[in-house]
Amino acid sequence: MFPNSILGRPPFTPNHQQHNNFFTLSPTVYSHQQLIDAQFNFQNADLSRAVSLQQLTYGNVSPIQTSASPLFRGRKRLSDEKNLPLDGKRQRFHSPHQEPTVVNQIVPLSGERRYSMPPLFHTHYVPDIVRCVPPFREIAFLEPREITLPEAKDKLSQQILELFETCQQQISDLKKKELCRTQLQREIQLLFPQSRLFLVGSSLNGFGTRSSDGDLCLVVKEEPCFFQVNQKTEARHILTLVHKHFCTRLSGYIERPQLIRAKVPIVKFRDKVSCVEFDLNVNNIVGIRNTFLLRTYAYLENRVRPLVLVIKKWASHHQINDASRGTLSSYSLVLMVLHYLQTLPEPILPSLQKIYPESFSPAIQLHLVHQAPCNVPPYLSKNESNLGDLLLGFLKYYATEFDWNSQMISVREAKAIPRPDGIEWRNKYICVEEPFDGTNTARAVHEKQKFDMIKDQFLKSWHRLKNKRDLNSILPVRAAVLKR
């Protein structure tokens, strides 16, 4: 695919190849998802690590030494594994509260009137088979039918679920992006030998669609030598070199490389082989961390992913999902959905950063952040609202309930909090807190006309959907499917 590809060349000397033929190709050819396959003894349902964590790293290309433990070799589940009862595959948490169910579960209440379910176990104790998110390799390459989806008994919920199943990112889509990442990393390491390239954003966080772009983060130095890059000077210089490399050496494989000098500068390009559009940034480390935070939320409750996808499609259709044009970024929209689900009378989602601070600490080294989802048990809400009611409630919340003038959306706190007084928050129409660095992810909405357009669309769509109970009233489903 790329000039310097070494596909098929054995990466290790004979003394490093040991007894296992799993790694017979260059380690950079395998995805970080596939490398993590070796981490678990799946056959015995023993999720203890079979590879030293110091050597097995997300996005790392170092040789991996295996133990004598049996390895998961990328096979499909055996038939007897597929037929295990649900309780044997995963355990869920039930609320300890005995209060009667709240009738109107789609209208958020103030913080003190909401119920939240604490974890059944202390955060430092996670039983081997108790977790909400399968290991990294299990999710990324699972066939869609193996992911349990919510039931849909009413028309609106069925429409949402059908749109999700049609438009969600497929395994083949992810593999294309991962292959490009692997081989681009090899090329970029000619310029920066210590660098690593991470696939981030919707491609990995569980909220991707078939048409989702690929987001890449170039980390120019590995930990513990990691350093902060000035995005206005050093990042632009690094990306200028990368852009030049793409134009001169990879013009046959990459088309339309373009250096965008934004607050966080990027190189935009299109991979001719996969036809995927990519955005590449430098050392935007928070993007790596929030990818795995969102990934955990995505698989924490089976209504989250379908709801997020249909809302992203709705926002895109109404032209309020484009930060480059002064509206909401997809990341902000996802945080808005998560916030809504956290603020219901019976929350559907908790604050993961509050319950599991050690799993989502900004101090975690980058090569370990992918393990966070494996430490989080399932979360079962008492809220039984269907997808249709949740979509309607989401629109109503931001059309009539949320105070845009004085409140900030905080997934970290699982509630709306007062706006800070800092300069970044002044004269901003929408405030959405980034869960790790505390910046405003909705800062692109800086014109009143665009803000009014966003609010107006929430209100109009809420009224239409409430009256029709048909997804086509706010989003032409056929057109959304064609775009995918």
Swiss-Prot record:
Mg(2+) binds at residues 213, 215. A motif (Nuclear localization signal) lies at residues 76-92. Expressed in brain. Within brain, it is expressed in cerebellum, hippocampus and medulla. InterPro entries: MTPAP-like_central, NT_sf, PAP_assoc. Pfam families: MTPAP-like_central, PAP_assoc. It catalyses: RNA(n) + ATP = RNA(n)-3'-adenine ribonucleotide + diphosphate. The modification Phosphoserine is found at residues 62, 69, 95. Gene3D superfamilies: 1.10.1410.10, Beta Polymerase, domain 2. Its EC number is 2.7.7.19. It comes from the Eukaryota. GO terms for molecular function: ATP binding; metal ion binding; poly(A) RNA polymerase activity. One of its GO terms (biological process) is mRNA 3'-end processing. The keyword Disulfide bond does not apply. Keywords: ATP-binding, Cytoplasm, Magnesium, Manganese, Metal-binding, mRNA processing, Nucleotide-binding, Nucleus, Phosphoprotein, Transferase. Residues 386-440 form the PAP-associated domain. Cytoplasmic poly(A) RNA polymerase that adds successive AMP monomers to the 3'-end of specific RNAs, forming a poly(A) tail. In contrast to the canonical nuclear poly(A) RNA polymerase, it only adds poly(A) to selected cytoplasmic mRNAs. Does not play a role in replication-dependent histone mRNA degradation. Adds a single nucleotide to the 3' end of specific miRNAs, monoadenylation stabilizes and prolongs the activity of some but not all miRNAs. Belongs to the DNA polymerase type-B-like family. GLD2 subfamily. This is Poly(A) RNA polymerase GLD2. The gene is TENT2.
